[in-house]
Amino acid sequence: MAFPYPGGMNVTRHLSDTRTGEGRVRFLTGGGRVRLVAEGPGWQHESTHATLEDAATFLAVVPRLPQALYEQALDDLERQPQFDGAA
């Protein structure tokens, strides 16, 4: 999913990209929306949310997401300078 950018270019910005032996979680932003992409062996999830906070909250209910990957993804996201907990 690419988001429109002035001048006809599409820009997707990675806010967080967490990888463990159990899978991967990415938070992407552009066009005023946040995309949550999570995947692991035998499963995958993609959803779009109005805010980063909504996407982070929704991560808790992604089916088959291992607890350790969930915790690491949130920890990585909170360490990002653009995340202030109220996005």
Residue ranges and their predicted role:
Residues A2-G8, P41-A87:
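Mixed-charge, Lys/Arg-enriched low-complexity segments
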Residues R24-A50:
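A short, structured beta-strand/loop element
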Residues T12-H14, G21-G23, V37-E39, L52, ...:
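Short, well-ordered helical secondary-structure segments
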Residues A2-G31:
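Short N-terminal "domain-start" leader segments
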